Every structure is written in structure tokens, then in C-alpha cells.
């Protein structure tokens, strides 16, 4: 996907990363794209990224609306939050705290992760690499700090 300025996420309430690292770091256990399955050793396309988490508090990254909550055999409990043209899915959750239809702001607690957090991101219906989305969020946070806004 070619990224443009219009793809920058705009949020009146500011920006927040989806979780705070408890000990200063969190391990990425599975990246986006072609991967080797850790159990079967077969190649497959991973549509998101996985982090090793254990009951992490997950927060809204910007102004948004909870647009989906459900459960599948593959991803367990999941929650979808729409931020403008972005749609972010948190999966393998222990609990979804923000109900369907809830309006959220940056930093609002929305769910609790399980031992693993799977994140998928779509922009205008097209799947994108979640790490690029997280990098954009981090860039927005840095820009706000430089302008003197609190986190």
C-alpha cells in the first residue's frame, strides 16, 4: 500500500499506544505476512501481528467506536474498534470491557489481553501491516510531545 498524508489518523483526544509494556519491553512473537507456523512448520500468511502479553490492559489508540465483538475458534474473543477509516482488531482477549457501539477516546480502557495479543489493521477496508500503523501512532505521540501536549 502506498501511504499518503490523508492516511494520518486524526484524533481530538490525542493518541495512545494500545498497551503499556509492563517491564519495559514486549516480545513480538509472530510478524505480519508470510510466516512459518510455530507448531506445524507450514508456511502461511499471517494477517496481523502477535505479542506475548499476559492480561495486559488494552486501550483505545484515538477517538473511535467499538464496531464489533465476537468469538471465533481461531482468534477466540475479539474486539474491533473503528478509528475514522482505520479498523483495528484485538484478538485472543481475556475480556472485552467496552461494549459494542461504545464511543472511546485515546487511553480509554477497552479490553484485557489473554496470554497472546493478536492485532489486525485495515484502512478503508484494505489490510495493512499493523506494525506500520503502530509506527504512525508513535510518530503522532512524538509530534504531540514536541508541541507541548501531555501524553
Each language-model region and where it sits:
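Surface-exposed, glycine-biased beta-strand/turn segments
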Residues: 1-77, 105-106, 143-145, 149-151
Amino acid at each position: 500500500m502506498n501511504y499518503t498524508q490523508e492516511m494520518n489518523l486524526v484524533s481530538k483526544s490525542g493518541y495512545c499506544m494500545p498497551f503499556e509494556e509492563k517491564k519495559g519491553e514486549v516480545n513480538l512473537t509472530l510478524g505480519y505476512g508470510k510466516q512459518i507456523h510455530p507448531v506445524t512448520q507450514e508456511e502461511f500468511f499471517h494477517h496481523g501481528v502477535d505479542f506475548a502479553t499476559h492480561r495486559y490492559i488494552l486501550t483505545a489508540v484515538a477517538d473511535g467506536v467499538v464496531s464489533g465483538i465476537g468469538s471465533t475458534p481461531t482468534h477466540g474473543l475479539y474486539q474491533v474498534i473503528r478509528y475514522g477509516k482505520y479498523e483495528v482488531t484485538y484478538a485472543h482477549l481475556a475480556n472485552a470491557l467496552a461494549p459494542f457501539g461504545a464511543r472511546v477516546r485515546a487511553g480509554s480502557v477497552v479490553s484485557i489481553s489473554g496470554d497472546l495479543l493478536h492485532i489486525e489493521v485495515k484502512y478503508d477496508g484494505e489490510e495493512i501491516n499493523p506494525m506500520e500503523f503502530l509506527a504512525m501512532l508513535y510518530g503522532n505521540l512524538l509530534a504531540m510531545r514536541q508541541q507541548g501536549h501531555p501524553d
